[in-house]
A protein has these predicted regions:
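Short glycine- and Lys/Arg-enriched binding-loop motifs that mark or flank ligand-binding interfaces
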Residues: 6, 14, 25, 88, ...
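Rossmann-like NAD(P) dinucleotide-binding subdomain of oxidoreductase/dehydrogenase enzymes
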Residues: 121-213
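Terminal low-complexity tails and localization/encapsulation signals of metabolic enzymes
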Residues: 1-34, 67, 71, 121-147
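Alpha-helix N-cap/helix-start motif
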Residues: 16, 43, 80, 98, ...
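Proline- and acidic/polar-enriched loop/turn elements at helix boundaries
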Residues: 18, 62, 88, 99-100, ...
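Histidine- and aromatic-rich ligand-binding microenvironments
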Residues: 7-8, 22-25, 31, 35-45, ...
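Glycine-rich loop-to-alpha-helix module at the N-terminal edge of alpha/beta enzyme cores
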Residues: 30-119, 130
Length: 213
């Protein structure tokens, strides 16, 4: 039985906790795989890898970050059928619905490619006597998204494209019931040029969620 693992440091890695849960094909009711459930220690290691990648990613010019997201968007456009099939096999929605959710997520990716224009700071002169006001837009660091079963591609794409465009590193904890779409997107982000550690996928249940929170 195939075991679905995590995506840490730019590559897929096997779980070490020894805990798994089955993944079913809703069309047949048969088990298609099992997914590793991360321990709190594994979550901590994944977050540490993301933190290590953060300084270089935050220092990457916004335009370069946007170029990577633009390449990712093109991969989504070219391979939408592939990702839709992965979603259908684990979630059970029909292919047309799966493509629809991907397309809605792609709209956010497209928006994020315009982030360089939105990341400009502001300077206001003479707000007071000999006082100027300066504002800077800077990344926060490592951020996380915990996403539900019903939209395994769209809801993550509501989160990570903007976070990445703004210079943050992102840790995604997808539903353990349909975990594979997250890994597909992680591989395509890497193919688009995203540096290792900037995007992480941790599979898991309540223990992983509690560790992230």
């Amino acid at each position: 039985m195939h075991t679905i693992g995590h995506f840490v440091g730019g590559s897929q890695v096997a779980g070490r906790s020894g805990r798994t849960t089955p993944v079913f094909n809703p069309a047949t009711g048969e088990q298609s795989a099992e997914v590793a459930l991360a321990s709190a220690e594994e979550v901590g290691a994944a977050v540490a890898a993301a933190r290590a990648a953060f300084p270089a990613w935050a220092a990457t010019p916004p335009l370069r970050r946007a170029r990577i997201l633009n390449k990712f968007l093109r991969l989504l456009e070219e391979r939408i059928d592939e990702l839709a099939a992965v979603i259908t096999a684990e979630h059970g929605k029909v292919l047309s619905d799966a493509k629809g959710e991907i397309q809605r997520g792609m709209e956010v990716v497209e928006f994020a490619t315009g982030a360089p224009q939105l990341l400009k700071g502001e300077i206001t002169e003479n707000v007071g006597t000999r006082v100027d006001s300066h504002s800077l837009r800077q990344p926060l660091g490592v951020v996380a998204g915990i996403t539900p079963f019903n939209f395994p591609a769209m809801v993550p794409m509501w989160m990570f494209p903007v976070a990445l465009a703004c210079g943050n590193c992102f840790v995604l904890k997808p539903s353990e019931r349909d975990p594979s779409a997250a890994l597909v997107m992680a591989e395509w982000l890497k193919e688009a040029g995203l540096p290792d550690g900037v995007f992480t996928v941790v599979q898991g249940d309540k223990e992983a969620v509690d560790a992230l929170l």
